[in-house]
């Protein structure tokens, strides 16, 4: 009897100490824990863009929204049917750009923050109010992105998080601006010809094939950086997209490569990729 009691106490103690984690559960999901660690790899946006090109997108040079090819020198090869819109056709937004400059932007690839920098930047006082060191050579105080990037290490790490960066046609990136994503009525027309990216009334809807990737990027940023919150109604839309549009082999390889470089995982991507056996460098 005493031996049984002692043995029972030992088992309880072992369980409480966490030895249960050694039990051989399903190998595709064992030891997977939500990641709360964010980017601590680089604070240089310039350096990170080069790494994205050379270490992540080296064999998948396609833009996110319109699936356009781009070269190692970031020159866009426009897909068939891609068109630059008449800016007057996009409701409620006045763009400070000439048609000629917009056309030039359509010819180059840019790295887009899927969660716009302004959305999380405004949570930093350096962005919203400035800093005593944010003074120009002419003695004029400034705030916003320039001040946050100059004075806040935490902002720089969020700004250069590789999971939040995707290649985009420059004109699409410019017109999407800092708009949140939504689900338009089915009657809403494409903004860029055959590319099914839609922008209207200061909102945007991406093509179906990338809605899952976008949702998992937003949800990762909110989970990893608690100062950022998505808010409604966007949060409900993104949660629905995450459920409806599962990971692809490319999304899995992209996350695998970023983890190798940046050091932390996006578990919203990694877990389903592991379950499918797709969390690896090869995506073809």
Locations of the language-model features?
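Nuclease and nuclease-like effector domains acting on nucleic acids or nucleotide cofactors
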Residues: 1-107, 125-134, 185-201, 278-284
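Domain-level detector of nuclease and nuclease-like folds
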Residues: 100-284
């Amino acid at each position: 009897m005493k031996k049984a009691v002692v043995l029972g106490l030992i088992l309880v103690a072992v369980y409480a100490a966490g030895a249960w984690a050694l039990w051989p559960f399903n190998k595709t999901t064992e030891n997977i824990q939500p990641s709360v660690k964010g980017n601590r790899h680089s604070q240089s946006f310039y350096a990170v863009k080069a790494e994205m090109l050379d270490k992540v997108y080296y064999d998948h040079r396609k833009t996110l929204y319109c699936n356009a090819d781009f070269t190692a020198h970031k020159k866009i090869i426009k897909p068939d049917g891609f068109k630059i819109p008449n800016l007057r056709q996009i409701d409620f937004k006045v763009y400070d750009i000439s048609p000629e400059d917009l056309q030039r932007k359509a010819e180059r690839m840019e790295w887009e923050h899927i969660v716009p920098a302004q959305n999380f930047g405004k949570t930093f006082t350096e962005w919203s109010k400035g800093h005593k060191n944010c003074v120009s050579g002419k003695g004029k105080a400034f705030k916003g992105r320039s001040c946050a990037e100059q004075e806040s290490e935490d902002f720089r790490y969020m700004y250069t998080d590789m999971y939040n960066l995707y290649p985009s046609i420059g004109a699409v990136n410019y017109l999407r601006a800092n708009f949140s994503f939504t689900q338009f009525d089915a009657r809403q027309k494409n903004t860029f010809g055959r590319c099914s990216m839609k922008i209207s009334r200061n909102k945007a809807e991406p093509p179906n094939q990338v809605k899952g990737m976008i949702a998992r990027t937003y949800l990762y940023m909110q989970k990893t950086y608690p100062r950022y919150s998505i808010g409604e109604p966007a949060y409900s839309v993104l949660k629905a997209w995450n459920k409806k549009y599962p990971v692809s082999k490319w999304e899995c390889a992209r996350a695998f490569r970023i983890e190798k470089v940046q050091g932390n995982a996006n578990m919203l991507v990694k877990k389903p990729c592991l379950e499918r056996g797709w969390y690896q460098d090869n995506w073809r």
